[in-house]
Curated annotation (Swiss-Prot):
Protein EC: 2.7.7.8
Family according to the record: Belongs to the polyribonucleotide nucleotidyltransferase family.
PANTHER family found in the cross-reference section: POLYRIBONUCLEOTIDE NUCLEOTIDYLTRANSFERASE (PTHR11252), POLYRIBONUCLEOTIDE NUCLEOTIDYLTRANSFERASE 1, MITOCHONDRIAL (PTHR11252:SF0)
Biological classification of the source: Bacteria, Pseudomonadati, Bacteroidota, Bacteroidia, Bacteroidales
Name this polypeptide is given: Polyribonucleotide nucleotidyltransferase
Keyword Magnesium attached: yes
SMART domains: KH, S1
MF annotations from Gene Ontology: 3'-5'-RNA exonuclease activity; magnesium ion binding; polyribonucleotide nucleotidyltransferase activity; RNA binding
């Protein structure tokens, strides 16, 4: 007999979330089925009993998968089964991973796998906002050491009011879309996009989300009590030698502090200097001793290096590269560097550099999104590439990783709101990171702004981005907020807070916090300091290019749009696409047509004005209504014994009878001298009311000969 344990969370708006354990996947270390409405997510967690020898990090793997059957759909493709993870699934994985990872004990190194699967969906509630809660609940009912519980919610602002976990329909009306993850006491992760909101609005949204999360966390703690999983497993994944730890600190700390305070701006030289201190310490040991103690020395020295860097900032206000806490690295920009793309830019900030290109395309270039719960076409794309050479690493370049998808998505959210809604082009921005020493995603935002303006894209406003950091020791009042952080400051610091925006407000943000007890006062200081940094960077961008170019590059496609009555869509496409394909072959233009808002919307793209004008002329001819008495220049399409058929408007043929070719009597059609392809001026005499056939005449346009008198 199965006796599952169920915990119900009552939400302020009347909706409920249930957490059920003990019914499914009982061999996993922890499993929970979360249900909200008809949306159901199963989260399972499994951890190895021991760590792989030599592992000194947290080998956590989070997977999120949506079943097409959850929404009563078949997957696409020939195999008709789910394939590799979509971008949306990868982004959801990252949201959960970033919320969970900081809460595992520092000395816990066993492999942990968290799997979240969407088994049912109703198209109303958004499952990505529930995945974090499901994963945390699975960890809560397991014996895996974890410093949670946490929960994750989406907060949207709709008509000035904050809504927690809005529906798909509600989110479309929001001017703020923010995902927040937190424990009962502390915010851990924030990510979202917004329509140029203030720093105070962002903080208010985070506070509203945290209040909702507290309810979720309390329910999980009660679930742990009911399940009996409050006591976690014992483990020993690190061996320590306190005498060796003390020896490393005494021998190396002062030297490491001196390097941290030296202000060397070259990260490789600085790292070599740090490494030399450790290597010098190791010289006192034999090879046999280093085989036993080498890994411990490396770990203890890493702690020394971290402490030296942090104390130097807190005590002297001096950063690794010599900057003050609010100082931005030197910036230089260039636009139009690449002649081939339709727009390009280089943005360099210190040792971080992005080379970004822009390509303009037509509707045919749109990205087709076919996720389980979301099907649409995307006209603004941004791709981020992080090759190994950007950090001087000697390794092969593999496919696109989760990090690249996540960084690209953040930059995409930062910029997309500044592309006008009716902009006719499909736009692809590609950022290739040439050098990296911190905040390469923010360099992508800045380079993307420059490249878009260089391409002549009608951006509403330029956008800049900055990454903020924090140094704060537990139990110590003193702290330092850092502007424009280095890679080492991200790694050794307590916060990575990325903020993008225009002069009028924030457009996107991403925050990861590794420290407990971070107050909203500190977050507000970080946001206001970020605003100053963003404005400084914006000034540098607009010095390089003040506004979008007035015209596109000569080799960029030109697009014209026109609307037609929807009943003419079929006439323009033709049977099997014959007419539209023929127009494209004849003119060299690319033509797309679709029905929107009760009319046919046509986009005509070409590399020059002539091909677009030619296509528009043909289309106007097709949709033109033939009028009796009008004169047209037509083309002979076929020759018959009794006359010729003339196409006097695109797709409209009429009979020019042999008797209507000339005033004089013609015995045979050959006497007229007409052949296929000849142009001839005709007048529309009549339209048969029953058949719709057109009767044409050429002779009425000729002078009528005078009648000769009979002798």
């Amino acid at each position: 007999m199965i006796n599952p344990i169920v915990k119900t969370i009552e939400l302020p708006d009347g909706r409920t979330i249930t957490l059920e354990t003990g019914k499914l996947a009982k061999q996993a270390d922890g499993s929970v089925m979360l249900r909200m409405g008809n949306t159901m997510l199963l989260a399972t967690v499994c951890a190895a009993k021991d760590a792989v020898p030599g592992t000194d990090f947290m080998p956590l793997q989070v997977e999120y998968k949506e079943k097409y059957s959850a929404f009563g759909r078949f997957p696409g493709g020939f195999t008709k089964r789910e394939g590799k993870a979509s971008d949306y699934e990868i982004l959801t994985c990252r949201l959960v991973d970033r919320a969970l990872r900081p809460l595992f004990p520092d000395n816990f190194h066993a492999e942990v796998y968290v799997n979240i699967v969407l088994f049912s969906a109703d198209g109303i509630d958004m499952p990505d906002a529930l995945a974090g809660l499901a994963a945390s609940a699975a960890l809560a009912v397991s014996d895996i050491p974890f410093g949670g519980p946490i929960s994750e919610v989406r907060v949207a602002r709709i008509d000035g009011q904050f809504v927690i976990n809005p529906t798909f329909e509600q989110l479309e009306k929001a001017d703020m879309d923010l995902m927040v993850a937190a424990t009962y006491d502390n915010i851990m992760m924030v990510e979202g996009e917004m329509q140029e909101v203030s720093e105070q609005d962002l903080l208010a949204a985070m506070k509203a989300a945290h209040e909702a999360i507290k309810v979720h966390c309390k329910a999980q703690m009660e679930l742990m009590e009911e399940v009996g999983s409050t006591v976690k497993r014992e483990y020993c994944h690190e061996e320590n030698d306190e005498d060796l730890r003390k020896a490393v600190r005494e021998a190396c700390y002062d030297k490491a502090y001196a390097i941290a305070a030296s202000g060397n701006r070259n990260k490789h030289e600085r790292q070599d200097a740090f490494d030399a201190i450790r290597d010098e310490f190791k010289t006192q040991y034999t090879e046999e001793e280093l085989e036993e103690k080498g890994a411990l020395i490396d770990r203890y020295y890493h702690d020394v290096e971290k402490e030296a860097m942090r104390r130097c900032i807190l005590d002297e206000g001096k950063r690794l590269d010599g900057r003050k806490t609010t100082e931005i690295r030197p910036i230089w920009c260039e636009v139009g560097y690449l002649p081939g793309p339709h727009g390009s830019a280089i943005f360099t900030r210190g040792e971080t550099q992005s080379l970004t290109s822009v390509t303009l395309g037509t509707k045919l270039d749109e990205k087709i999104v076919d996720d389980v719960l979301d099907q649409h076409r995307e006209r603004f794309l941004l791709h981020y590439n992080f090759p190994p050479y950007s950090t001087g690493e000697a390794k092969a370049q593999r496919g696109v990783g989760r990090r690249e998808i996540g960084h690209g998505h953040l930059a995409w959210r930062a910029l997309k709101g500044q592309i006008p809604a009716g902009y006719p082009y499909t736009v692809r921005v590609v950022s290739d990171i040439m050098e990296s020493n911190g905040s390469s995603s923010m360099a992508t935002v800045c380079a993307g702004t420059l490249a878009l303006m260089d391409a002549g894209v009608a951006m509403k406003k330029p956008v800049s981005g900055i990454a903020m950091g924090l140094i704060k020791n537990a139990g110590e009042e003193k702290y330092a907020v850092l502007s424009d952080i280095l890679g080492d400051e991200d790694h050794l610091g307590d916060m990575d807070f990325k903020v993008t925006g225009t002069r009028d407000g924030i457009t996107a943000t991403q925050m990861d916090i590794k420290v407990d007890g971070l107050s909203f006062e500190i977050l507000e200081k970080a946001l206001l300091q970020a605003k100053e940094g963003r404005e400084h960077i914006l000034n540098k961008l607009t010095e390089c290019i003040a506004e979008p170019r007035k015209d596109l590059k000569p080799h960029a496609p030109r697009i014209e749009t026109m609307t037609i009555p929807k009943e003419f869509i079929g006439a323009i496409i033709g049977p099997g696409g014959k007419i539209i394909q023929g127009m494209q072959e004849e003119t060299g233009a690319t033509i797309t047509i679709e029905e929107t808002d009760g009319v046919g919307r046509i986009e005509i793209a070409g590399t020059n004005k002539k091909c677009i004008d030619d296509a528009m002329r043909i289309i106007k001819g097709i949709v033109a209504v033939p009028e009796v008495g009008e004169v047209y220049v037509g083309k002979v399409r076929s020759v018959m014994p009794y006359g010729v058929f003339v196409e006097f408007l695109p797709g409209k043929d009429g009979l020019l009878h042999i008797s209507e070719i000339d005033w004089k009597r013609l015995e045979t059609i050959e006497e007229a001298g007409l052949k296929e392809g000849d142009e001839i001026e005709v007048k529309l005499l009549d339209i048969d009311p029953k058949t719709g056939k057109f009767k044409l005449s050429h002779k009425v346009l000729l002078p009528r000969p005078e009648k000769q008198e009979k002798k």
